[in-house]
């Protein structure tokens, strides 16, 4: 909402969740096991 596009690998902790229908959520990588 009101954001800007970023380059691939610009935000290394950003998580993009999707399924066969497409994008459904985003999150932040906390460590190698956890996404919030």
Curated annotation (Swiss-Prot):
Keywords: Blood coagulation cascade activating toxin, Disulfide bond, Hemostasis impairing toxin, Hydrolase, Protease, Secreted, Serine protease, Toxin. GO terms for biological process: proteolysis. Pfam families: Trypsin. It is found in: Secreted. It comes from the Eukaryota. InterPro entries: Peptidase_S1_PA, Peptidase_S1_PA_chymotrypsin, Trypsin_dom. Expressed by the venom gland. Its EC number is 3.4.21.-. Residues 1-36 form the Peptidase S1 domain. One of its GO terms (cellular component) is extracellular region. The keyword Transcription does not apply. One of its GO terms (molecular function) is toxin activity. It is an enzyme of class 3 (hydrolase). Belongs to the peptidase S1 family. Snake venom subfamily. Thrombin-like snake venom serine protease. Shows strong hydrolytic activity towards Boc-Asp(oBzl)-Pro-Arg-MCA, a synthetic substrate for thrombin. Monomer. This is Thrombin-like enzyme TLP. It comes from Naja naja.
